[in-house]
């Protein structure tokens, strides 16, 4: 079992060093990480621990990765990897640094 911040500082799958929490939703937490093999930043989406035994949700999570991996467009992040290790289901994708959609909404609302 893990808590969101407990992955920070850990290395996932001997490859992705988890640096910080980027955001969290009902299903998953997204982290900024560094891929040690390719020396680049990536985003790692990890299925919440409380959902790890929900087989339907795990299947949905994996299908999300497969569907997104088939897409190629400048406005869609690329999927680099997907997997499960020690009960953690994860998707590794392109990391985009910048302002979030939530922040844009707050600015526009002012």
PLM feature segments, named:
Residues 34-41:
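Conserved N-lobe loop of protein kinases adjacent to the ATP-binding glycine-rich P-loop
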Residues 18-25, 30:
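Protein kinase glycine-rich loop
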Residues 48-70:
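AlphaC helix of the eukaryotic protein kinase fold
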Residues 106-110:
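Activation segment of protein kinase catalytic domains, centered on the conserved DFG
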Residues 23, 63, 72-75, 88, ...:
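Flexible N-lobe loop architecture of eukaryotic-like protein kinase catalytic domains
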Residues 2-18:
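A short, low-complexity linker immediately N-terminal to eukaryotic Hanks-type protein kinase catalytic domains
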Residues 82:
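Activation-segment/catalytic-loop signature of the eukaryotic protein kinase fold
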Residues 86-100, 104:
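Conserved short submotifs of the Hanks-type protein kinase catalytic core
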